[in-house]
C-alpha cells in the first residue's frame, strides 16, 4: 500500500507526472518519487503550477491532493471512483438516525477521553483538570465543545510555560492560579504560531484518514456529524477526531524542543517532524501498532459497523499507558 505523505512547500514550483513518477521542479532542482508509493500530496506552496497529467494519474492511483492556505486544507481533489463498494455506500446512507447518533457519540467520547489523557500528561498539576475530567467522562450535552474549550486553555498555558521568559506558575493559588486563566492562546483556524503548527499537523492526519477510507471502499463525502459544516470529506473529519490529540502531542513536543514562539513556524524541519507522527507506535485493543495502522483498524471496524448496523464493531482509539511518553 502507498505510504508516503508528500509535502510540497517550495515558493515556486511545477508539479507533473511522467512515466509514473511524481515530479517536482523548483529552484532547488528536480525531485521524483514513484506515484504508486504516494498516499497523498499536501500542497502548501504559495505558487505551484500543477500539470493536468498529475490530476489524472493521481486519480488512477487513488491519491488525494490536499491544497492548503495558511497551512489548512481549502481544497481536496479526490478520485471520481473513490467508493467502489456500492453496497457499503448504500448501507452508510441508509443508517438509522439513532445508529448514526450512537456512532458519533462513541467518537466524541473517545476524543474527549484522549484530550483528558493528554492534558493530564502535559499539565498534571493544572487546577482545571478536575472539571475537564468530569466533563470528558460524563454525559453532559455539548461535551465536545466544553472539553475543547477546557483542553485548549490547559494546552495554551502548558505551551506558554515552555517559553523561558514565562514566570513560574503554581498549580493552586497566587500567581499560578491567576496565570493559568490568562493564557494568550486561542485555538482558531487562523492566527499563526501554534495554530499554523496544528493546522498543518491536522492536514497530515486528514490525508492519512482519507487513504484508509479509500482503502476499504468508504465514501468520505458522507459523514455522521460534519456534513452540515464541512463541504468536502465529512466522514474523514468525523473519524479523525479521536486522533487529533496525537497531533497536539506532536506539536507540544516540538514546542518543548523549540520554546521561543519566534520558532513556532511551519518550516521544512517542522514538516519533517510532524509528518512522522503516523509512524509512532501506540496501543490499540491488545496490539501495539503504528498510528496509521490503528487508523486503518478503526476505519475497518467502522465499515463493519455500517454494513451490519451494529455499533459494537466500531471501536475508536483511546491511548494506553505510556502513549504520551517522550
Residue ranges and their predicted role:
Residues 2-13, 17, 25, 33, ...:
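Active-site helix-to-loop segments that bind/position phosphate- or nucleotide-bearing substrates
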Residues 8, 17-43, 50-51:
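A positional/architectural concept
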Residues 36-85:
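Glycine/small-residue-rich interface belts in oligomeric ring/scaffold proteins
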Residues 167, 171-177:
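A cross-taxon signal for low-complexity, glycine/charged-rich
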